[in-house]
Amino acid sequence: MQNRNIFSWVKEQTTRSISVSIMILIYVITWTSISHAYPIFAQQSYENPREATGRIVCANCHLANKPVDIEVPQAVLPDTVFEAVVRIPYDMQLKQVLSNGKRGSLNVGAVLILPEGFELAPPDRISPEMKEKMGNLSFQNYRPTKKNILVIGPVPGQKYSEITFPILSPDPATKKDVYFLKYPIYVGGNRGRGQIYPDGSKSNNTVYNATAAGIVSKIVRKEKGGYELTIADASEGRQVVDIIPPGPELLVSEGESIKLDQPLTSNPNVGGFGQGDAEIVLQDPSRVQGLFFFFASVILAQIFLVLKKKQFEKVQLSEMNF
């Protein structure tokens, strides 16, 4: 009886351990897939998202060129919170190819490269009106040491094709490396999935070309989607197998003669990446005060001139009457 109880206890503990192990494994796999699906591959591969040529590195994976727009104030005062509005326009009716080959809505993402000293505004400095414009977005620093570079995404494009960044301007009085100057701001924005992964491999959201010339001798439709094409290369007497993942639409058929690099599929990509820039002036408050003083003095001078002119006209009129 005692041996039976011990056996039951051991069986129960073993079952529990296996269940916990499976749960941990599922969590690790899920977490890894989510993190790798996050379109911040640039953070993993590049210290700075903007190359010396001015090109933003997101364009290495998102090959199609699409527009993006940024709107910022012409000038801001030190230690002031302002809005940087990034617009990523696209046709909301479009559906993109997902990693499993099915169709789904497009996500969007953006990277905002601010001047040194500018950074994401703290929550207690953001007004309720600005929070309402931001929605439920959560911004990140590109690097812990690069607070002036912000990233966001992927987020649903139908809800966030216009993204409001809350920015805090620096104060040269407390930051000695910041000056009252005109500064550039750079932005990159993408809609939809990329065509190339950071390791150089293709996603299923791009065109697949023939890796050899010859005759398509066999096409096998795979159980989980996609195709396996066998190309008979008569010139070299060999067979080449091209694997096409689920998503792209096949354009060739068995028995068809194809050339090297000929497209085997359609291009399913409906998204793309764009970059833009803007300028902002960090304005010295004393200059603003001086400008107001100048305008006030000009207005007063004009008033005095008008009064003096009227007084002179009255004197002339009285002399004529006399």
UniProtKB/Swiss-Prot annotation:
UniProt remark on cofactor binding: Binds 1 heme group covalently.
Gene3D superfamilies on file: 2.40.50.100, Cytochrome f large domain, Single helix bin
Cofactor(s) the protein requires to work: heme
Residues that span the membrane, as ranges: 288-308
Protein name: Cytochrome f
One example GO MF annotation: electron transfer activity
Oligomer and partners: The 4 large subunits of the cytochrome b6-f complex are cytochrome b6, subunit IV (17 kDa polypeptide, petD), cytochrome f and the Rieske protein, while the 4 small subunits are PetG, PetL, PetM and PetN. The complex functions as a dimer.
Gene Ontology terms describing biological process: photosynthesis
Lineage: Eukaryota, Viridiplantae, Streptophyta, Embryophyta, Tracheophyta
Entry similarity comment: Belongs to the cytochrome f family.
Record's keyword terms, sorted: Chloroplast, Electron transport, Heme, Iron, Membrane, Metal-binding, Photosynthesis, Plastid, Signal, Thylakoid, Transmembrane, Transmembrane helix, Transport
UniProt subcellular location: Plastid, Chloroplast thylakoid membrane
Membrane topology: Single-pass membrane protein
